Amino acid sequence: MSQSPFGNVEKAKPEIDFPGDNPPSELVIEDLEVGKGAEASAGAQISAHYVGVAWSTGEEFDASWNRGEPLAFTVGVGQVIQGWDQGLLGMKVGGRRKIVIPPHLGYGDRGAGGAIKGGETLIFVVDLMDGR
């Protein structure tokens, strides 16, 4: 069994603290841990574990960790919300990044089902697990 040049990463589900204050109007990216693997770029196929929290309530609305399997997708081609496509660029495999996504880069005024209300700012902590 050969190891990917991008590496495989062992991590645990992160906790996200309640943000308080007013949400930002622009995308906010904060590297909590810088990875040492390959860098995510537009067109890269990646897998990422994440926890998503609503800014207004601090409540978790989704987490790949709860399903035991990371989300796999291609960066920058619209398979995920714009905040993810933009917020993951330049992230390296093995890294952990906090991304605060304003509504216009998330689910906008429509929200997402019953889990995310319209106009909600989203907080994600994303672990880039693999890429190619």
PLM region spans:
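Cross-family detector of peptidyl-prolyl cis-trans isomerase
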Residues: 1-132
